[in-house]
Structures are given as C-alpha cells and as structure tokens.
C-alpha cells in the first residue's frame, strides 16, 4: 500500500512560483509541483481555520459539520462523522499528526480528535506557546507582540520556531516508519504564513521593500456591499498596528506599512518553503519517495490589501483560493531510479534555482471537501459513498468528488493540461456575518450571533454570492431574505472589483447556490 504524507499550511494563498507568482521564491514547493498534478482552481469551503479544517478533514461542508466558528466539536454537535486519518487508521494505516492539523481547542475536542483519528497522541511543537507573546524586538529595543516579527532564531525562547520543530519531528517519524510493516499516514501542519509573521529575519533579504508593490486594487470597491467586507480585527490587535491608529472598519493601512505586511507574508512563505524542502528531501533520503503519495494544500487564502482588505474571513478568491497538488509515485512522475533524488533540497537564497515548470495541471474547479475521497482513491482504498441529503446520521460518506479521473494519464508525455469540461464545475464557499455592516465581530461571529450567511459559487466564468438571512438556532438560511448580492465575471474582472449584481438580477443563478 502507498503511504500518505499530507502537508497542510495555515493561511497560504497560491503566492508560489508554481502558481505563476513572479516575486515569491518557493523553489521546494515548485519542485514538488513539477512532479505533481497541480490544481489551478482549488477552493476552500469557508475561509477561516477551524471550519475549513473540520470540513476538509471530514469531507463534509460547513452546513453539515455545523461549525462556522471556533466553539463546537462536530461529533457532539452535528454527527459522528469519520475523518480522513480515521478512515486510513481503520484500514490498517499508522496515522500521525504533527503541528497544526486539526484546529486545536474544542473544535477537535481538545485532543486533535484523538483517539478516533490518530494511532498515538499528536505532536505539538513546544515553542508554539510563544507565537503570540512579546518576542518581537521593536525599534525601541523592547519586546512586543507585533504583526511583523522577523527574529534572530538564537534569541527567541527555546532557540527555535514551531515549524522547524515540526519538520524535525516529522523526519523522526519518517525514519521510524521506514522499517514498519504497516503503511503510514503522516499529516504535517505548518503555521507560517499565519500571523504573526514570526520568521527568521534573513528571509526578509529576499524581498527588498523597493521591490514590493501594493495590491493592484488596494481600495475598497465602490460596489462592495458592506456585509461582504471583513474588518481584519485580528491584525488591528497587534501592537505595531495599534500604534498606527487606523480607522475602523475600512482603514486604510498606511501605504508604507502595507508594503511591509506584504514583505513579511512573502518572507514567511519562503521560510515555510525551506521547511517543506527539508521534509521532502528526508523522504527522498529514506527511499520513501517511491512509495509515498504527497498531498500539499492550505486551509484557505489570505488577502494582502486586495479590495482594501486583509486576512481571510470573506468569500473573495483571495480568501478562498488555495494551492492543491498531489505527487503520486509512478503516476504524476516516473519512479526515481536508484540513487536519484526527486526532491533535493533547494536553497531559496541561491539565485540559480530556476523557475520550474509545474508538472501536470488541471484548470478544473475543485473543492477542498474532495480531498477525502481523492486520497482514499489514490491509496487504493474504497472511496466513501456520496452523502445522502441530509447526512447527519451517516458516519462515513463524502460531499466532495473523487478527483481520481484526473490522474489517468496514458503516458507522462501527454499534454500536461488535462482535458475536462470546466464549464460544468462549481466550487461552493460560504461565510457568516453578525450584521449588515462591518463591526467588531464580523470576521469571526459566534454561532449564536450569526444573522446572515453569504453563500458563494465560483465557476470558471464568475463568482456569485448572495448574503441571506440565517437562523442559528435552526441552522436555517432564508433565501427569500436577501441582504445583498455580488457578481463578478472572471475574464473581464479577475480581481473581483466590479460588482455586477444589480445589473443582472441573478435569478437563474439562484438554484445553483446549494450544492
């Protein structure tokens, strides 16, 4: 049986060389992409950590997990739904969790869903507890809890950072599993580029400020309904941002500071890339690259000033569009010859790392909720059946698609752009709001405060969103109570700045809104 290495990154938008970003240096992830099938149009089902992770790890949508906030455990609150690692464990795999896989806290029962999901207790890096403490040296020489936090690693508590510790632990587990009779499922969850941007300061050198531009559409668009806007409260709480005294809810953040946020996000991505590089290089050294599927994705994107917005918490592409790629030995790339390395470590500071061509790509719209059936299918396990509606009583079923057909190539020289009919495909996302206007809890409303749900569909041609009344006691959306709508056409308005909703009463689109 093939092993699985699932790499989940926190808050990573597709700002990667393999997704066409010319600025960001991500040679190791690009190298993985060159041996993988990469999905150009993959979307998360809700752009916030806990709901997205519970959704894709169970293969069910947020309306089924009933988790839109950070305050409940799906097995108690919605249904006893199986997870990806649980399914692999029940099929004879040793399942292991390193770093941030499930969102910690009540949403995974304070145990990362143990013992259901994991063969032994999940690993959390000891230095994680300093992530939000005052460890950033400010211009005044004092330590602060800042948003921008490039550090000298020898100076920080424990002399290390969480993602470095997670990589080391994951490599140790791979060494252990090399001789194991059972196949393994190893999930590795990286923290960066999640805020605060606490990363080794040398990565800043890759992105001189004079090379950093603002978002091409850094103003709040005229036609944006206020309910669609997220006021990025989490950023405002950091000491360096507080000091700027930015007006609520729309800002803007001063231009110079916008550049610095973008610089630190990209630097965090390059730091993350080195950790992924070390992990994949170890997989190679242990001769596991010919027997291990590698899946790489993120829980959602992150706005970097587009539409005058920052962070996640919205239905825009910048918040919902994620990287998604699968390396399948012998299928997406030829098996490595003896002694050949598929994943030699690449140094982002080495200017010789040429931009690599991605391997195979699919332009089809896909959803993170399809990760479960796809990993099961690639590993040769039985693919869980489609869920009935409703499916609260069904423990094992899938609301996503099995993407296996994308991996059926006759030979490796075939056209790397896979044919499909993208016109038929839809990716669904949603986001709750407590009010029609942005307020202190608009980014992360608690279930009891949700008054409006924004249901959004993304096709190859458009993104269409309606914000409708929502009753949190009954978990019921009222589609006749429309608070606002958005419609953006991808070809003419790729950045989603010109809301065409009022011009085109989207009646025919309406029946598409429910998966």
Regions found by a protein language model. Name each.
Residues 1-479, 494-512:
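Formylglycine-dependent sulfatase
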């Amino acid at each position: 049986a093939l092993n699985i290495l699932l790499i989940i990154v926190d808050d990573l938008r597709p700002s990667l060389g393999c997704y066409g970003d010319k600025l960001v240096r991500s040679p190791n992830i690009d190298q993985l992409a060159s041996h993988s099938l990469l999905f150009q149009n993959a979307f998360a089902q809700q752009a916030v950590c806990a709901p997205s992770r519970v959704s894709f790890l169970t293969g069910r949508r947020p309306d089924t997990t009933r988790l839109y906030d950070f305050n409940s455990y799906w097995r108690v609150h919605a249904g006893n739904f199986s997870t990806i690692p649980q399914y692999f464990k029940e099929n004879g795999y040793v399942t292991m969790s390193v770093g941030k896989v499930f969102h910690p806290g009540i949403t995974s029962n304070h145990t990362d869903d143990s013992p259901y999901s994991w063969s032994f207790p999940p690993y959390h890096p000891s230095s994680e507890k300093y992530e939000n403490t005052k460890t950033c040296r400010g211009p005044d020489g004092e330590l602060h809890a800042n948003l921008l936090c490039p550090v000298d690693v020898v100076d920080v508590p424990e002399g290390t950072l969480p993602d470095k510790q997670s990589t080391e632990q994951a490599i140790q587990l791979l060494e252990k599993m090399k001789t194991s009779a059972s196949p393994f499922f190893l999930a590795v969850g990286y923290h960066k580029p999640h805020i605060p941007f606490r990363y080794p300061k040398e990565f800043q050198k890759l992105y001189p400020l004079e090379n950093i531009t603002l978002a091409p559409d850094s103003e709040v668009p005229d036609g944006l309904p206020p309910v669609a806007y997220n006021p990025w409260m989490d950023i405002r709480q950091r000491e360096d941002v507080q000091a700027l005294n930015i007006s609520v809810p729309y800002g803007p953040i001063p231009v110079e500071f916008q550049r610095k946020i973008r610089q630190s996000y990209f630097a965090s991505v390059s730091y993350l890339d080195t950790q992924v590089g070390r992990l994949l290089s170890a997989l190679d050294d242990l001769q596991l690259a010919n027997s291990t599927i590698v899946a790489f994705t993120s829980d959602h994107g992150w706005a970097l000033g587009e539409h005058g917005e920052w962070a996640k918490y919205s239905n825009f592409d910048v918040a919902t569009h994620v990287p998604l790629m699968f390396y399948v030995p012998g299928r997406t790339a030829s098996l490595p010859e003896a002694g050949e390395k598929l994943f030699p470590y690449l140094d982002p500071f080495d200017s010789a790392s040429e931009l690599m061509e991605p391997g195979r790509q699919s332009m089809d719209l896909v959803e993170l909720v399809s990760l479960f059936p796809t990993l099961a299918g690639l590993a040769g396990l039985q693919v869980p059946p489609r869920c009935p509606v409703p499916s609260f009583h069904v423990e094992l079923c899938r609301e996503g698609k099995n993407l296996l057909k994308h991996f059926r190539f006759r030979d490796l020289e075939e056209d790397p752009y896979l044919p499909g009919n993208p016109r038929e495909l839809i990716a669904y996302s949603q986001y709750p709001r407590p009010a029609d206007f942005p307020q202190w809890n608009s980014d992360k409303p608690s279930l009891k405060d949700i008054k409006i749900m924004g249901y959004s569909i993304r096709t190859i041609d458009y993104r269409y969103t309606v914000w409708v009344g929502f009753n949190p006691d009954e978990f019921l959306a009222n589609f006749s109570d429309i608070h606002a709508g958005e419609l953006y056409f991808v070809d003419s308005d790729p950045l989603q700045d010109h809301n065409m909703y009022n011009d085109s009463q989207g009646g025919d689109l309406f029946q598409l809104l429910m998966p």
